[in-house]
């Protein structure tokens, strides 16, 4: 639709809100929870130096914050997550996110028993993902039809499980 007017979008933002911040461990008492998914443990610990923009292993500077670190895992997530959209009878909303993506986000930023808020619930994917991952949830929407869809989906999920 907009290809002749502006570059086509290849990304969609998902906002994560937390009381904490994303500073390095040791720099903040109030850090945002982060449990990266899909890590692969390295067979042996590896010494890693801070990389510079050129991509080689020279240290960027002599600052105390740029110390060599021991790397124990690999396969850390990037800012791009790829999930297939659901284009079948499980599609309830035009902007519906894949259920696996919702589960991934919930597992990445919360622990079991914690609370997730979705203020634009749409199809109810976040509520179903919370039920599947043992989280509490608060969901809301400004459209009654989305609230009804979500309530029905939650009831169906609870009947099956």
Residue ranges with predicted function:
Residues 151-161:
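Short, conserved SAM-binding/catalytic segment
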Residues 1-149:
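Core catalytic lobe of class I
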């Amino acid at each position: 639709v907009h290809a002749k007017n502006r570059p086509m979008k290849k990304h969609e933002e998902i906002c994560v809100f937390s009381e904490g911040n994303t500073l390095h461990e040791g720099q903040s008492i109030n850090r945002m929870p982060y449990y990266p998914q899909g890590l692969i443990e390295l067979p042996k610990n590896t010494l890693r130096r801070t990389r510079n923009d050129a991509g080689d292993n020279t240290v960027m500077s002599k600052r105390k914050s740029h110390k060599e670190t021991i790397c124990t895992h690999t396969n850390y997530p990037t800012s791009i997550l790829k999930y297939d959209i659901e284009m079948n009878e499980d599609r309830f909303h035009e902007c519906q996110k894949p259920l696996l993506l919702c589960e991934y986000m919930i597992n990445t930023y919360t622990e079991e028993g914690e609370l997730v808020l979705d203020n634009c619930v749409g199809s109810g994917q976040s509520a179903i993902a919370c039920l599947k991952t043992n989280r509490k949830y608060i969901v809301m929407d400004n459209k009654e039809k989305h609230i009804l869809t979500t309530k029905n989906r939650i009831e169906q999920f609870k009947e099956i499980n």
